UniProtKB/Swiss-Prot annotation:
InterPro entries: rRNA_ssu_MeTfrase_G, SAM-dependent_MTases_sf. PANTHER family: S-ADENOSYL-L-METHIONINE-DEPENDENT METHYLTRANSFERASES SUPERFAMILY PROTEIN. Its main location: cytoplasm. Specifically methylates the N7 position of guanine in position 527 of 16S rRNA. Keywords: Cytoplasm, Methyltransferase, rRNA processing, S-adenosyl-L-methionine, Transferase. GO terms for cellular component: cytosol. It is found in: Cytoplasm. It catalyses: guanosine(527) in 16S rRNA + S-adenosyl-L-methionine = N(7)-methylguanosine(527) in 16S rRNA + S-adenosyl-L-homocysteine. SUPFAM superfamilies: S-adenosyl-L-methionine-dependent methyltransferases (SSF53335). This is Ribosomal RNA small subunit methyltransferase G. Belongs to the methyltransferase superfamily. RNA methyltransferase RsmG family.
Length: 182
């Protein structure tokens, strides 16, 4: 995978900011950022297009959206995070890392103005069917969903009528959906 020259420097800056915020706001339990970065990047090996608009639902502490935005730096990222301390953190990170390709929406996605995404990502937010439901209006049949799942990914999609694939790496299941009907 071709990474931008400044990728690991930006990741180091992110890690410093995360540790500072985490002392006060308890955003995440992760102590070592490298496995999180690798987990965030892994599905890009299987993504066969360069999305113009990417939506990340329940962005939390920025996994995977911040790292994906560093790599897919010509894509426009919309991060939806309703918890104030997390959305504030994401906005601060965006400014500190000079990420001009991200917009943080401090709201639940279902409360926001609809935009069509080429790619919708989410990591450990909710069950697949619920996530699809709350994203209604943000996708069409050409949108790809990339969902970072653990166990049970296969059961979650058993009733879906769309193209799907699951790529496993360790305990992580990367779920790709395409052709989800609105």
């Amino acid at each position: 995978m071709n990474l931008p020259d400044n990728f690991w420097n930006k990741v180091s800056e992110f890690e410093i900011i995360l540790k500072q915020f985490n002392k006060i706001h308890s955003l995440t339990n992760y102590r070592d950022i490298k496995p999180v970065v690798e987990d965030s990047m892994k599905p890009l090996e299987f993504l066969d297009f360069n999305p113009k608009i990417v939506i990340d639902v329940g962005s939390g502490a920025g996994f995977p959206a911040i790292f994906l935005s560093l790599i897919l730096n010509s894509s426009e990222f919309h991060l939806y995070e309703p918890i104030a301390k997390k959305s504030s953190f994401l906005s601060y990170v965006g400014a500190a890392l000079n990420l001009k390709n991200i917009t943080v929406h401090p709201s639940k996605i279902e409360s926001c103005q609809k935009i069509k995404a080429d790619l919708i990502t989410s990591r450990a937010l909710s069950k697949t069917l619920f996530l699809i439901e709350i994203c209604r209006g943000f996708y069409d049949e050409n949108t790809t969903f990339l969902l970072y799942k653990g166990d049970g990914a296969k059961e979650e999609i058993s009733n879906l009528k769309c193209k799907n694939s699951i790529i496993s790496s360790g305990k992580r299941n990367y779920l790709f959906l395409k052709g989800v009907k609105c």
